[in-house]
């Protein structure tokens, strides 16, 4: 599979790039590796690990048709799901300046910045995100752009909380935009089907505030079934993240708390929410530092500590992330 990808890459560079309308804009690789350590009283473990090796291809087929591919080269390809290692494989048709349709494999659109961030830029997640079956899926989006930087999206795709081969779906309404210059948003309402064919409602509100060198993320997710007694604030997640930028350095911290009341069960005693079962809570937190030696995002060093209230294991990662440009159609355009 990887050999086929590189042959395809060579063909693109040799032939397709010469077409007037059909061309590749960018081809690049990004990767992250780390030295992971964890310890609890009386026990210490450590190992080197490769976290990500991603190949990105972006381009257009015509002036109204654009595409994107992101392939994880270090992820095992499942015979039952041959696109398991493919995050993005989509085609976008911009049929009107304010309207577009996107079809193919893409991110399942759920609000909050913890979900919205590229996985290579996230060092640890909470239970809500960790327990999804899939984060990317084949589906269809219709996007309306009423103004620059404001996108309203309707998405129909497989459900993130059911196996990929199961006929369970998610119906998503998503807004990515801003309220003034200092408040960015990634909000969604998601009507999702779980592996038992029951439906759940997610209201996910991601907010990013800019205060000089400080960026503050505040994410809130409310999860509920129409059948449960208390719809709001009984099954929820609250996540806060802060990044203080000082020259080439980022000082970072993230804290999340997730809770599902014990009363959120059906007549048989089964939890409505299978991601965070009724009667459970989860607290996770950590802090770290990032250093960008060359000043841009193409080289990053990080040191991150994190733990939670369940395993009570201290985790500490030392790592490096780098991006390498293979091809850029316009030298004037940044490739990352």
Where would I find each of the regions flagged by the language model?
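Sec-dependent N-terminal signal peptides
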Residues: 4-13
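Phosphate/oxyanion-binding loops and surfaces in catalytic or ligand/nucleic-acid-binding neighborhoods
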Residues: 14, 149, 327
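Surface loop/turn signatures of beta-propeller and other carbohydrate-active proteins
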Residues: 164
């Amino acid at each position: 599979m990887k050999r086929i990808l590189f042959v395809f890459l060579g063909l693109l560079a040799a032939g397709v790039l010469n077409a007037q309308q059909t061309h590749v804009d960018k081809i690049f690789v990004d990767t992250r590796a780390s030295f992971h350590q964890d310890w609890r009283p009386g026990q210490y473990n450590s190992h080197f690990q490769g976290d990500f090796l991603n190949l990105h291809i972006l381009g257009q087929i015509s002036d109204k048709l654009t595409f994107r591919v992101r392939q994880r080269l270090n992820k095992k390809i499942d015979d039952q799901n041959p696109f398991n290692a493919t995050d993005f494989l989509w085609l976008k048709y911009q049929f009107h300046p304010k309207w577009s349709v996107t079809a193919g494999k893409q991110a399942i659109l759920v609000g909050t910045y913890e979900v919205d961030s590229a996985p290579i830029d996230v060092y640890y997640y909470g239970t809500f995100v960790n327990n999804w079956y899939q984060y990317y899926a084949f589906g269809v989006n219709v996007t309306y752009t009423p103004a620059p930087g404001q996108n309203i999206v309707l998405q129909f795709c497989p459900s993130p909380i059911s196996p990929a081969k199961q006929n369970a779906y998610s119906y998503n309404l998503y807004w990515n935009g801003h309220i003034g210059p200092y408040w960015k948003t990634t909000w969604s309402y998601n009507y999702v089907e779980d592996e038992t064919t029951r439906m759940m409602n997610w209201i996910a509100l991601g907010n990013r505030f800019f205060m000089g060198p400080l960026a503050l993320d505040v994410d809130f997710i409310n999860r509920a079934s129409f059948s449960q007694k208390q719809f709001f604030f009984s099954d929820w997640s609250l996540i806060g993240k802060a990044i203080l930028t000082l020259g080439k350095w980022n000082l970072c911290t993230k804290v999340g708390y997730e809770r599902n009341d014990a009363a959120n069960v059906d007549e048989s005693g089964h939890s409505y929410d299978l991601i965070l079962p009724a009667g459970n809570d989860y607290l996770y937190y950590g802090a770290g530092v990032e250093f960008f030696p060359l000043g841009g995002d193409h080289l990053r060093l990080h040191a991150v500590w994190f733990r939670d209230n369940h395993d009570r294991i201290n985790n500490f990662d030392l790592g490096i992330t780098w991006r390498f440009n293979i091809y850029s159609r316009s030298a004037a355009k940044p490739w990352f």
